[in-house]
């Protein structure tokens, strides 16, 4: 349990849980950074291989990063898609691949006993080295991604978010939609996939995270085997900083046949290494991050019933990700809900939080932190973030302390970079 005491000046002092995760860090012979945590409570090993190969690397082929990631387990020189799936299933292992704007992540979860881990790891390694991208699989993934695009077009929140990103980032690579578009996916060729694969799935572009019931010596062997599957290649260039688009109309209305209106409003936010990261995290918890306790929820949903749900957030990336407020409301209430959301934000910027609100936000963030690293998966996710974005090795050990050290003035100062009058607004619904 965390105990918090509030002092007269509005700062907060806490007896924070002293969570220590011993993260071992080294590089393989060909320079791939490795992050390892031994966790022996359960007989599981989790491995993540990350590449600087997110949708921001799509260039002129929207969706190619996602397409390539989905193709890796579709066939190798000696195994077809069914044989690959059977090899993982027969050992109880789970393989997955996913991307965001910055990265592609390949994950393996396996029992640690050699009779299960060795064949699962062997199959995982082969996918890195010997993926062949057969045409039959390309056709199959095309169909799957076109279905996903159709589902996206039928999901108001997903369609509004896609429009928000494309409007906010304009010509910046973060505007590239993860799923691509119908035309780009229909035109994907084997040559495009191979070019993306050979350019991005290389040692200079990679990072490895390992968590679980394994010794450091064995983890070093695992990392060497994985990195040895990769050509050396070249690292992707650092992502350029985005800037707010120069457009006359900041309100984008998208016609959609739904009874409710989905609204996104926001601006360019922060990169993950921004010095204001912690004041903004704590401040956002007060503004809209605490789903049932935030100012936005209290003013727009609880007091006036103008929306079904509302929240705000930052999505820090390698370069500046977005700051956003999102809500769903009835069409006839959309204008009032948007106006009140904007006014609530302006009031927060003008007055800042109270000492009591600061206490509550810290308590919520500090209190929820231990559970986020209680499992292998949670630790792996945190290590991916630390390794990929080159955060300090003691990031997890100091997280609660840094949350606790945030004061009212830091929040007020950090939030002055939020400019309501320049925000992009996307309203999706019947017009």
Regions found by a protein language model. Name each.
Residues 37, 42-67, 81-127, 158-183, ...:
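M16 family metallopeptidases and their MPP-like homologs
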Residues 188-192:
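Active-site glycine-rich loop that binds ribose-phosphate moieties when present
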Residues 101-108, 136-147:
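Short, glycine/charge-rich beta-strand/loop segments that flank catalytic centers
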Residues 3-91, 122, 194-299, 424-431:
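His/Glu-rich zincin catalytic helix
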Residues 193, 411:
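Acidic/histidine-enriched active-site and ligand-binding environments that engage anionic O-linkages
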Residues 110-112, 145-152, 243-254, 364-372:
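Short, conserved secondary-structure transition motifs
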Residues 415-417:
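Short, exposed beta-strand-loop hairpins at the edges of beta-sheets
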Residues 78, 128-136:
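Short, polar/flexible loop-turn hinges at active-site or ligand-entry regions and domain interfaces
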